[in-house]
């Protein structure tokens, strides 16, 4: 699933081609996504000019002067800019055709993407209203983590992946941040000390910043005729490295299951 860095890089990649452009038409090939697409999306959007492309957690917000298109890429979704006459593929479900001759195309093999139009404040929409702070802003800190974690029995990994606690941190970067902080992923959130929380807040910011920086070289890939950018060419310390040597101590990286997801960690370095 695209996490905060992937969504932020998508935003940075597409925004220069969208802002100030007018929607000429909307082509819907598959309305049955995670939430059914509104049947009148073409009549709603045609003629409107895009004023901004923003991000909230793992969601993209395509803003117009009177309304916002909220997008979530689900498990396998991606957005690409293609020439408007580019033939669609099997999993190309929606095109936003622009007056520049380009179109923003949604591709999603598993169809778990979400696209919702709202006239109201998108940050108050049910999809976003309960989101916690953005991890790369001043609203997020170790003190915040410490306060929110008091009395919580869930594991620290599940805690930092809860969008009500923190917006946008998914499985990959939770594993990496916990490794850098030296915190075992199965530690109860309520057992974290102030020092733990200060260190973890720092490593969450570091991991996300590094991932976004690694994605900088992929920005040009958003204007293509086929293919898509994958996860960043980042050298993960633990994620996906089951049984490989830990970069810190050489012990084998372990894998467990938490909340239906694989968790990667080092038993020696993380306590």
From Swiss-Prot:
Q: Which UniProt keywords apply?
A: DNA damage, DNA repair, DNA-binding, Glycosidase, Hydrolase, Lyase, Metal-binding, Multifunctional enzyme, Zinc, Zinc-finger
Record SUPFAM superfamilies:
Glucocorticoid receptor-like (DNA-binding domain), N-terminal domain of MutM-like DNA repair proteins, S13-like H2TH domain
Q: Enumerate the residue ranges forming zinc fingers (FPG-type).
A: 237-271
Against PROSITE patterns, the record matches this protein to: FPG_CAT, ZF_FPG_1, ZF_FPG_2
What biological-process GO terms show up in the record?
base-excision repair
Cross-referenced InterPro entries, in alphabetical order?
DNA_glyclase/AP_lyase_DNA-bd (IPR015886), DNA_glyclase_Znf_dom_DNA_BS (IPR015887), Formamido-pyr_DNA_Glyclase (IPR020629), FPG_cat (IPR012319), MutM-like_N-ter (IPR035937), Ribosomal_uS13-like_H2TH (IPR010979), Znf_DNA_glyclase/AP_lyase (IPR000214), Znf_FPG/IleRS (IPR010663)
Bound cofactor: record note: Binds 1 zinc ion per subunit.
Q: Does the keyword Transit peptide apply?
A: no
Known function: Involved in base excision repair of DNA damaged by oxidation or by mutagenic agents. Acts as a DNA glycosylase that recognizes and removes damaged bases. Has a preference for oxidized purines, such as 7,8-dihydro-8-oxoguanine (8-oxoG). Has AP (apurinic/apyrimidinic) lyase activity and introduces nicks in the DNA strand. Cleaves the DNA backbone by beta-delta elimination to generate a single-strand break at the site of the removed base with both 3'- and 5'-phosphates.
Quaternary structure, from the entry: Monomer.
What name appears for this protein in its UniProt entry?
Formamidopyrimidine-DNA glycosylase
